[in-house]
Amino acid sequence: MDKNMQGKIVKGISGFYYVHVAGSGIYECKAKGIFRNQKIKPLVGDNVTVAVLDEEQMLGNIEEILPRENALIRPAVANIDQALVIFAAAKPKPNFNLLDRFLIMMEYQKVPVTICFNKCDLLTGEELHAFSDVYEQCGYPVVYTSAREQRGIDALLERLDRKVTSVAGPSGVG
């Protein structure tokens, strides 16, 4: 069967790529060898053309990777609308060097970034704004949350609504 469809890679595991095709579902696909020969690795978020091998079993081959809007190495994703960088406001103390590196990486890829400081219940408002104001003055939206107290969650969800978002940050941010 020579039926080609376009879709988006939603998951990649051990050389298998799961491609969501609107109106049809998710196809399990392998990438053609030409990608390996050209050292091109399909990424989650890639828009692709799939040659359907078995419509009933929903199997196919990725024939083409369409042009990417952006691509990140860690996490390995493409065509995202934005990034959410989450850091703890305290416990552990934020590593601003690491946060700045995240921001530089996203700026280089032209990916809009929202910074989320979690555990804001552990600091006073004055302490929190002492470091977060710097990022807001640079034009980065900053969201303050407390997962423990369920504060700021609605504001965070509003920023994520209807957007493909890559989430990054160190461990221990809550």
Where are these regions (language model features)?
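Residue-level signal for inorganic ion chemistry
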Residues: 45, 106, 118
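N-terminal accessory targeting/assembly segments
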Residues: 1-96
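Conserved catalytic network of the ASCE P-loop NTPase/AAA+ motor domain
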Residues: 75-78, 107-109, 159
